[in-house]
Amino acid sequence: SGVSGDERRVGLLIASFIKPHCDKLFFDRTGNLIAFKKGRSTPKSPVMFCAHLDEVGFMIRHINDDGSLLFEQAGMMPEVLLSKRVLIGENKIPGVICSKPVHLTRGKEKEPPQTDNMYIDIGAQNAKQAKNLDVYAKYAAFDNAFTVLGDGTAVCSKAIDDRFGCQVMIRLLSSVPEYDSYFVFTVGEELGGTGALAAVRYIKPGIAVILESTTASDLPQNTGGNKVCSVGGGAVVPFMDGGTKYDERLVKRLWDIAEENGIRVQTKSRIA
């Protein structure tokens, strides 16, 4: 696991895979893992490929007298958290996210709870037991099994955002790029993209290609433009996202490359 702020182990694992394929490999002060690979030619400014190491998760901020844990989270909607299993700290202490039982709620309490009204139950009977498990100020990640769905073309897992992007970059590093390229495995994306900002300032790329997951809403109740994009419909090359308008020439070039190589692509019909 590599929750935002605790990505180092994931970075070290990836570094062990890609080291034989890099001309230069290092961690910057932000925590980004940066790989440089010499291409067939050297442009005025290098190309940068980018995918983030971190996943959504939690940090334990307080231990209650009864041994339950309060937490902070980033990058998630609170209503999806209840009943989720988590693993806390280096010792992977198991816990479950809980709130007041719905059959005991009254009035506004029946509304979806916010994280301030949730806690993690680790089975401790009191604060002393919880402290002995070394969970205070530790990171917590979801405890989900990697599951293959259907005919094997779909999977269910935590951290798909953005370990799939990391895997694509690992594969790219096994070949020689057309141009001198940096491959940046960034930290802090779920906290606002702090790692990516630091990498751009250091590398000063002419072109940056971000390999990310995105929103698909191809559900039975959604039709046409409300689907955003479809799982299995090909790689998504959007024209814009929230806060970002992509260079039209670069978008067109990516679409042309896809057509020339028989690669299925789609765009997003909504900014989501």
Q: What are these regions, as identified by a protein language model?
A:
Residues 2-272:
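N-terminal hydrophobic/helix-forming segments and targeting peptides
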